[in-house]
């Protein structure tokens, strides 16, 4: 042990002189402040991205710091320093044994690990890495740093870029720290922001207690105890004693027998005795349990004391007086219509509906409204009334039709040529001439119709030909069409430019006239007229064959 101590002291003395010179040079450059200069240099090197320069600067700082600390701690821990220096001496001697190789490999790994830790801590924690007055470093670390600084000449020759395994290890360390910090920053099981509202239960209706027909659904005092309310209504108060599936509107005695626990709320308009708040008004909401006698008594109290209509949370306001209420009850005895009974319950304040509905009923008057509904006949009765009306006589109806046909003929010929009004009139006349009864009226306007045929456009000619085709089926009207002017106008339509429909109608008119002559329905007495007629027929036949 004594030899080891002497050897350590000798080595310290030999290295004292260059260390002192390095320290003096560093003090001159930094003007007595070593740590800020070293830190500034290291930061500048880190910004340039050169890792080797940063290591060199840190080594200079470490030398100045370690040499001062070795002097103070050499005496306190000679064993640790001696052991570290002994290891260093054995490795610096370049012995060719297996133990020496193992120690060199360990020192190399420790060297790079220590340098990385020093650089990283200095780079990320600027102030903490450059603080030379820190007392956090342990004594064994001081000895190890001394060994590392003295090993610099030997290790500098073997210093090579770090392998991929070391870089991967560093990335793994940084990655683990990053993701662990990320996991701790977020809640893996976040709570939902919105509150899930569970649906309220629906009360099931007891089918045994339901009325069989609407005759049992009444609200006068001698009626059955219960009447059906809104089916499937979602109750606003699930904890109430009686389910809201039925409404009690019988007398007080029957109400006590059927539902003894049901009592009506009778506070004033400005007070509320019920513990539950008023729900949102709907047109078809939960009915209130109320009897006819209780409603009548409340109306009398209001009339005597001058209290405004009641404002119980479970019912609407009742604006009727005693006389109107008794009339309403008498009207309800005469009908079982569910609509009328529902209107009556709204007027009595039994149904908590939308204020607009009750305001409308109160303004119109519930008695007036129900009386008008009762006096309004059903659709079946109105239909029977229409059917049993005496129809007009045949002569009257025929006279009206004749007046209509004459009016249409005058209007048609008076309209401008090819005007929409004229074409509409021709269309109506074509529908009216399907019956032979009105042909004698239209025959009086043949001259105007043939003028339209010869001077009108294609659509006008088509409507006139349809009308004349209907007239040609009647022998009496066809006889009036056999004259030179009419036949000449009919012959003009047979040309290449005429529409096919018009040609077909013209051919049909000639065929009908020919058939009437052949059958003897039309007799031609004048031979000149007959010869002229036959010449026109032969000419038309030749044109048709040519086309």
UniProtKB/Swiss-Prot annotation:
GO terms for cellular component: cytosol; nucleus. It is found in: Cytoplasm; Nucleus. Gene3D superfamilies: Leucine-rich Repeat Variant. Keywords: Cytoplasm, Nucleus. Pfam families: Arm_2 (PF04826). Residues 1-10, 38-48 have a biased composition (Basic residues). Residues 1-53 are annotated as: Disordered. InterPro entries: ARM-like (IPR011989), ARM-rpt_dom (IPR006911), ARM-type_fold (IPR016024), GASP1-3 (IPR043374). Survival and differentiation promoting protein that plays a role in the regulation of neurosynaptogenesis. Induces phosphatase PP2A activity which results in APP dephosphorylation and inhibits BACE1-mediated processing of APP. Homodimer. Belongs to the GPRASP family. This is G protein-coupled receptor associated sorting protein 3. It comes from Macaca fascicularis. The gene is GPRASP3.
